[in-house]
């Protein structure tokens, strides 16, 4: 597997290139805010784009989609989770050469948030960061995100976590690391504790020296 994390500008955004080494077909995840950096990586790896995937619809993840429209080598690029007519179901899979992309619906940060699992890697968008979780608006969204994060935590502890922004101390981590170190994940047994941290996060960060 070819797997590339791409620093794509904006608010420390990450885009991703996932490709089959057998067919050189590629999936691009969140090609924004600077799609040219993604295009450069596609050229460098000499791959053919098959899928454009958005982890969610926020502009800083989806604005570059239109740079990848049209047909390449006689085949249309397939857009996934890029609007109402491209919705992917929870647990649905797609083939990418010898690779299987598995989609996990993780609403909370947004209603359309998804994570993508391929082999031992999990691209989490704005659902889960290194040491942090995605922002939510109000108690109801926080509850939905709480349930989504619990769904992710049943994955094997060595599953690699690849987030949508560089908000942590490292560019990636693992499910096991997050279970032991992420203050939000450590509060997934009780929603009231998770919600408390959501509501008091600025103060908590200051008291614990978290950037």
Language model region names:
Residues 15, 26, 101, 113, ...:
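Structural motif
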